[in-house]
Each structure stands twice: as C-alpha cells, then as structure tokens.
Amino acid sequence: MKILSTLSLIALTILISSFSPPAPSFSIALLKYNGGGDWYANPTSLPNLAEFCNKNLDININPDPPTVEAGSPEIFNYPFLHMTGHGNVVFSADEAQNMRTYLQAGGFLHIDDNYGMDPYVRPAMKKVFPELEFIELPFSHPVFHQKYDFKNGLPKIHEHDNKSPQAFGLFWEGRLICLYTFECDLGDGWEDADVHKDPEDTRQKAFQMGANIIQYVFMGRSDL
C-alpha cells in the first residue's frame, strides 16, 4: 500500500506539473531615465500587451515587466526595452555609451511618445548614436505586416495635435535597432480600458500593432 501511495503521489505531481504554465521565455523591460520625464507613465500598458501577445502569438512574455536604468548592466538581460513618457529625457555620457553598446550587441529599443517627448528624445538618442538619423519607415516596412496588416502604417490611438502618426527608426548595419512611434500613443491604447476610455476597436488596433512589433523583433525581423 505504501508503494502504491507513493506512486500515486508521484503520478499526481507529474499531472499537476504538466498543467502548470511554462516559465516566461523573456521579459520586456521598462527603461528608467533621468531628466524629469515620467518614464513610469502608462503602468498597465506592458502587462496588458504581454497578455495580448501571449494569447495571440506563439510566445511567452513575462506579464510583470522589470524596470531597468539606462546606465545599468542589467539592460543586457533583456532583449527588448520599452521607453515612454511626456517630457524631458537626459542620458549621461556613461548611460549613452551603455545604451549604444546594448543596441549594437543586438538589443532593441521601442520609444513610444506619450506626448511631449519629441524635443527631448531626439537629442538624447543623438547622444547615443551621433552618426545616425531617425528615418521614417515606409508603410511597406515589415513591422506593419506581421500577424496583423496595417496598410497605412501606425494606427492613430490618442489625438493630441491633429497630426498623423509616424514611425521612425534608427538602423545599425542594416538592422532596425530603435523604433520611435510618434503622434500615435500606442501605450495609451494598451492601458486598462477604464484609464483613457478609448473605443474597444481603437484599443484592439493598439494591441495588434504592439504585437506586430513584438513579432517583428523576436520572430520575423528582416530589414534587408
């Protein structure tokens, strides 16, 4: 009886473990920066995006995103950094060098302008890559044509200045290393529904475009 009980316990343990969700394969980290801008804006965005991607893509993202500082070696633990906010962005010389090394080594940075970042984030990234210029991505770029097809480029999620959304990129040796989404506000669309009260179809477009970015970076990146 003792042997049978032990075997039953082992079988039950195996059965339970077989239904346990797999450990997250990777995390999207939120980038903390200096200068006074609210790097912590849209706190529910990344968890909600992770949940959407885990349901709709063959992927397993940690739903609890870590926060990393621009100058920390910890950024090298995460293949994808997300940066957002409304205001000033400042990188010290050491932070700029750390970010440069990270991006050259294969890391990816998504900057989502939450409104008001543009005058600050461009000089900050110029400090990281003085030799590079942001290039507007054409609607034909693969990031718009992953699982979800966006024939006209970025969707407009949150209205501010009646301007069209634009996607800009920094390229290093033919690889898109930084995607800057401007006048779009994807992160607002990823927030909990009751935060901005965006229409559900608008939120779905935001999630779908976010999923495209994730799929492009991890599953289908091709810039050539």
Please identify what each model-predicted range represents.
Residues 7-17:
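Bacterial N-terminal signal peptides
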Residues 28, 80-119:
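Short alpha-beta junction capping motif
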